[in-house]
Amino acid sequence: DWNVRGYSHRFYNRGQDSAGLLMYEQSCFNVVAHNSITHSGDGLFLWAGQSTMDSGKGGANDNLFYANDFSHAPTNGIEATFSRNAFVANRVEENWHGIWGGYSYQSVILGNTFRNNVEAIAIEHGQDIRIVGNRFEGDTAAIRLWWNKLEPSDWGYPKYRDTRSRDYVVLGNSFVGTRLALRVDNTQRLRAEGNSFTRVDSLTRLSGDTTGWVMVQRPGEATTVPARPRVSM
């Protein structure tokens, strides 16, 4: 806890890449469970490493983060990029981003509690992600997914990998008192099913190419009580 720099309360909160837990350079097959990792620039900073950035191969993969507290970070409760991991039953509260998962793939976000984050889950260029059974409460935006056309020219990674934003399942989550549940930009083949929405200002905001977008709420499967339902295209 309390490993933070670049922070002045109410004035400046960049974090400057300080972190409670740093994992990088092909750090794989670890279990991180039952820890308090709060009030740090990032709670967790997980990065695949320079070799992955140059070659598009490898990653900091197949780690399990279970029942930890990643709260009160001025930047990201969890930052996990260019890798494949599982985040299960964690507490993620009052961060700028609860999870920042840029370029993550084949990852699972299961049974976590997100509360009062600016963006609870933010993933750019993500692929094959499962967001299942989480609770989002009081977040400004619960889930934001997107693709940027322009990527840094000095990165080898996008030269060797498909970096489209695609293939998400958002299943059985509860959204309570969030301003926006799903913001989806240039992301293909997202299926949202069996989620519940209570006192949510806007359910979805879609833009760009969202081919294959499906949202299913079967009668009796979930209670939907939006304050102002809106779909923007």
Predicted regions, residues:
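Consensus "Asn ladder" position of solenoid repeat domains
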Residues: 2-3, 30, 35, 63, ...
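Acidic, glycine- and Ser/Thr-rich low-complexity intrinsically disordered tracts
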Residues: 17, 139, 149-155, 160-163, ...
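Right-handed parallel beta-helix
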Residues: 20-22, 53-67, 72-76, 98
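Solenoid scaffold repeats with emphasis on beta-solenoid/beta-helix
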Residues: 21, 29-30, 37, 42, ...
